[in-house]
């Protein structure tokens, strides 16, 4: 099984506002960078989309170490999602899960991709080179959404 290290990040200028996502994928000596953006989005949507795009870029089942600075995404996929699904995509307080269509996409990728994923939280803006690069790519995504890239 291929070993892949992934760094993801999302950014938003205003919340909601124009946003971007960035991904760094590393496998051995190979490295690939991805980014994109949307107008009228939120930081959490961009954090989710970064992970979705990263996992969607993998062509075969991989052993993935995925670094992200979003506890919302990490806890959502590792702790909360099973409860949401049991409750018909509702939170513990009975409210509809926000960004449900993205959560469903991520759940499908995690469940059906054949990947073994180690979800690792990293403090954002704390000097981690992979996270800093993903952040720069996410900001490039904001510029792209605004037509400046």
Curated annotation (Swiss-Prot):
EC number(s) on file: 3.1.26.4
Keywords: Cytoplasm, Endonuclease, Hydrolase, Magnesium, Metal-binding, Nuclease
Residue ranges of domain RNase H type-1 in the record: 1-143
InterPro entries: RNase_H, RNaseH-like_sf, RNaseH_domain, RNaseH_sf, RNaseHI
Cofactor: Mg(2+)
Keyword Magnesium: yes
The UniProt record lists the keyword Transmembrane helix: no
Reaction(s) catalysed (UniProt annotation): Endonucleolytic cleavage to 5'-phosphomonoester
A GO-annotated cellular component: cytoplasm
Note on cofactor: Binds 1 Mg(2+) ion per subunit. May bind a second metal ion at a regulatory site, or after substrate binding.
Subcellular localization: Cytoplasm
BP terms from Gene Ontology: DNA replication, removal of RNA primer
Binding residues for Mg(2+) 1: 9, 47, 69
CDD domains: RNase_HI_prokaryote_like (cd09278)
Recorded GO MF terms: magnesium ion binding; nucleic acid binding; RNA-DNA hybrid ribonuclease activity
Enzyme category, top tier: hydrolase
Record: residues binding Mg(2+) 2: 9, 135
PANTHER family membership: RIBONUCLEASE H1
Matches recorded under NCBIfam families: PRK00203.1
Protein family (similarity comment): Belongs to the RNase H family.
Subunit structure: Monomer.
Entry function: Endonuclease that specifically degrades the RNA of RNA-DNA hybrids.
Protein name, entry field: Ribonuclease H
Species for this entry: Paracidovorax citrulli (strain AAC00-1) (Acidovorax citrulli)
